[in-house]
Amino acid sequence: MIKLISWNVNGLRACCDKGFRDIFTQLDADFFCLQETKMQEGQLDLSFEGYTSYWNYAEKKGYSGTAIFTKHQPLQVTYGLGIDEHDHEGRVITLEMEKFFLVTVYTPNSQDGLKRLDYRMTWDDDFRAYLQKLNQSKPVLVCGDLNVAHKEIDLKNPKTNRMNAGFTDQEREKFQLLLDAGFIDTFRYFYPEQTNIYSWWSYRFKAREKNAGWRIDYFLASASLADKLKEAKIHTEICGSDHCPVEVTVEI
């Protein structure tokens, strides 16, 4: 049985000032994946006994970035998608394990005014193709901030956000294509109807206090892993970022 955690920390140095180290230790995951680390190599001395860490930094300072802490030695580590257009922002790390691939991702935000929506569409297609290729050789676990609320149940105010970044028809359709390509949204696998549970809240308008949030952080799993999934959780009680950690437990 392995426990995996994914958390968009919205700046790891800031999160460390808000109790990250204690939270990490308490959660005691086999794999702990981070998005939006917002740092460069050497800016933070962070290590945990029993874990090896892998980092993918954005070239732009204080932006994006991903990391994985693992108790288990991977066979191979890959950074990025192998596509130059996508590989300057530190958005993807892949660990090849004996029985599966683990991919963590910080999906590009389409931004205000949907300035980056066209790029996002290209990203979604290329990322889906990347996962499908991995899935041909081993099952895949995918986690991270996918920057999309899949259905109306996945955000507090679907009607007012209909054409906003993260809830456009185009982004939602691309997410559905990813599921159709052979992946399971693990939280919905266990809790298909659960409402009012989110993983991100704006810092504005007392959104977290009012639970006016979005579920945009996911663990996806290859459909072949369905019978091995044991539990999925969203840790809404954990603060330290505008996102909260999400979790999956797998018998693998």
Question: Predicted regions span which residues?
Answer:
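Surface-exposed cleft-lining segments at the edges of enzyme active sites
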Residues: 82-83, 108-124, 159-163
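Active-site beta-strand termini and strand-to-loop segments that position acidic
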Residues: 71, 95-98, 222-223, 248-252
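Structured beta-strand-rich core segments of catalytic domains in phosphoester-bond hydrolases
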Residues: 38, 43-110
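N-terminal, active-site-proximal structural segment of metallo-dependent hydrolase catalytic domains
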Residues: 1-48, 58-64
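Active-site beta-strand/loop signature of hydrolases that rely on acidic residues for catalysis
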Residues: 8, 24-42, 102, 131-152, ...
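Active-site-proximal beta-strand elements of phosphoester/diester hydrolases
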Residues: 2-10, 99-111, 143
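Conserved beta strand-loop-helix elements of the APE1-like EEP
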Residues: 61-76, 205-227
